[in-house]
Amino acid sequence: MAGVVRLTTTSVQAIRVSSSFSSFATALNPLQPCLPPNSNLNSDKRLRLLSSSPSCSSSHYHPSSGLGSHLPLRRPKSQVVRVKVDENVAETEPPKWWERNAPNMVDIHSTEEFLSALSGAGERLVIVEFYGTWCASCRALFPKLCKTAVEHPDIVFLKVNFDENKPMCKSLNVRVLPFFHFYRGADGQLESFSCSLAKVKKAISVSPFPQLELGITLQTKRTTSLFFFDRIYQIL
């Protein structure tokens, strides 16, 4: 009987120890939310499961509380930088073909700007190009015109967009593109012709600047000048 009593006492102690371990395991369970309920897994497998579990990959451990809290991960800084770079690239697009001017080329956007540019040129030779952004011949000729402008820095080149200045262009009888006008000081318009860069170079080289005559008499030039400004002021 004494042996039975001792066995019973040992069984009770074993049950208490088992209960204590169960309580301790239950207490640890919140600290390991990613572990599966299988208690036969060794510690290495538990660690691998813990690191590869989706819920653990988005958790952050807080030492102060001893618990893992599920917080959203911050977006990497590299993505933010990439967005800013793309925005800067969009803001700095290369200029259109008609915007690539030589230093002595001026864009004209109105009749007032046109008259002001002619007046400010003084006795310098002024070459006016009438063009269209949609004109294939204008686009093909433009790089050569820019080169000519660089080779003659004393000449003023004015660029008139036909679509932006239709009333003025029509009053000047500009009916084909590209079209060129030559002006100089009080002499007014000296010459006008369409398209050919060879004509532009020939007109420049006919006589040394500033005595550019182009085969036009002084009386003809004065008449042309007065007629031109009368037509311009009718637009205003």
UniProtKB/Swiss-Prot annotation:
Localization (cell): Plastid, Chloroplast
Disulfide bonds: 135-138
Keywords: Chloroplast, Disulfide bond, Electron transport, Plastid, Redox-active center, Transit peptide, Transport
Domain Thioredoxin residues, every copy: 83-220
Keyword set includes Lyase: no
GO cellular-component term (any): chloroplast
Catalytic residues, chain numbering: 135, 138
Main subcellular location of this protein, as a coarse class: plastid
Record flagged with keyword Signal: no
InterPro entries: Thioredoxin-like_sf, Thioredoxin_CS, Thioredoxin_domain
Transit peptide, start-end: 1-82
GO molecular function term, any single one: oxidoreductase activity, acting on a sulfur group of donors, disulfide as acceptor
Xref: Pfam families: Thioredoxin
Family statement drawn from the similarity comment of this UniProt entry: Belongs to the thioredoxin family.
Function noted in UniProt: Thiol-disulfide oxidoreductase that may participate in various redox reactions. Possesses insulin disulfide bonds reducing activity.
Annotated protein name in UniProt: Thioredoxin-like 2-2, chloroplastic
Species the sequence originates in: Arabidopsis thaliana (Mouse-ear cress)
The organism's taxonomic lineage, starting at the top: Eukaryota, Viridiplantae, Streptophyta, Embryophyta, Tracheophyta
